[in-house]
C-alpha cells in the first residue's frame, strides 16, 4: 500500500507535530496503516486510513463513547476525517499477547478484560451505543462464530472442514440465537482479543485495560 508521505507530513504539521520521527507499527486486517510518531519525548500514534477504502468516523464515534464511559480507548489528539488521518494517544506496547508470551500470569489479565465487559453490560444501551452504529445482528454474530470452522480449524487440522460440517455448525448457532436475544443489549467490541488489549500502568480497574 502506497504511503501518503506528503499528506501525512502536512497533517502532522497542522496538528503541531512537524518534524516528528516515525516508526511503523504492526498493520491490522484492513487498509489502515499505523505509525508511532515521536517529538520532544512525546509519543502518539498516526492512523492512515485512505478514503474510499476506510472511514475513520465510526472509529471516532466508538472511541469517544468508550472514553466518555470511563474506558481506555485511545484519546483523539487531532483528526482530518476527509483525508483519513487521525493522531491518537499512544497506549504503549504492553499488549496482553506480549505479556502472556513473556510469561505473565494469565488470570489477572483476563480478569481485567472481563471487568471491561461487565462495565459495558452495566451501561444502558442508550448510553453505551453511539448514534449511527448498526445493531449487532444474529447473522453477524453467526458469521463471527463461524470463523472457528472457516479459519481456525482448517489451520489447525491442515485441511478444510467438509461443507456439511460447516453448515451444521452454523445451524447449531442459529438454534441458540433465541437464547442470545434474551441477553441485555450493549455495545459489542468485535476485535476484543489479546492483540488489541493493552495493560496501562497507573490506571485502575477497567481503565487499566487499553482498548484498540
For each predicted feature, which ranges?
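Regulatory N- and C-terminal appendages and interdomain linkers associated
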Residues: 1-24, 31-33, 41, 54, ...
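Short, conserved clusters of charged catalytic residues that mark active-site
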Residues: 7, 29, 58-61, 71, ...
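Short coil/loop linkers at secondary-structure junctions
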Residues: 18, 72, 158-162
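Structured loop/turn residues at beta-strand edges in well-structured enzyme cores
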Residues: 20, 71, 207
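Glycine-rich loop motifs involved in handling phospho/adenylate chemistry
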Residues: 23-26, 50-51, 136-137, 189
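ATP-binding pocket architecture of kinase catalytic cores
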Residues: 32-143, 147, 153-157, 182
Amino acid at each position: 500500500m502506497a504511503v501518503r508521505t506528503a499528506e501525512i507530513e502536512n497533517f502532522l504539521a497542522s496538528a503541531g507535530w512537524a518534524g516528528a520521527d516515525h516508526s511503523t507499527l504492526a498493520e491490522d486486517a484492513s487498509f489502515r496503516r499505523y505509525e508511532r510518531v515521536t517529538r520532544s519525548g512525546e509519543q502518539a500514534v498516526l492512523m492512515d486510513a485512505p478514503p474510499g477504502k476506510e472511514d475513520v468516523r465510526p472509529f471516532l464515534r466508538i472511541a469517544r463513547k468508550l472514553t466518555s464511559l470511563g474506558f481506555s480507548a485511545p484519546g483523539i489528539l487531532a483528526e482530518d476525517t476527509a483525508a483519513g488521518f487521525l493522531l491518537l494517544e499512544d497506549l504503549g506496547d504492553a499488549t496482553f499477547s506480549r505479556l502472556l508470551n513473556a510469561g505473565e500470569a494469565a488470570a489477572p489479565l483476563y480478569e481485567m478484560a472481563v471487568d471491561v465487559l461487565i462495565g459495558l453490560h452495566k451501561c444502558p444501551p442508550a448510553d453505551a451505543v453511539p448514534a449511527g452504529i448498526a445493531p449487532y445482528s444474529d447473522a453477524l454474530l453467526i458469521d463471527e462464530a463461524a470463523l472457528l470452522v472457516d479459519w481456525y480449524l482448517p489451520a489447525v487440522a491442515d485441511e478444510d472442514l467438509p461443507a456439511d460440517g460447516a453448515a451444521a455448525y452454523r445451524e447449531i448457532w442459529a438454534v441458540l440465537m433465541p437464547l442470545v436475544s434474551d441477553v441485555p443489549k450493549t455495545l459489542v467490541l468485535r476485535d476484543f482479543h489479546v492483540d488489541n488489549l493493552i495493560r496501562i500502568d497507573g490506571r485502575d480497574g477497567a481503565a487499566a485495560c487499553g482498548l484498540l
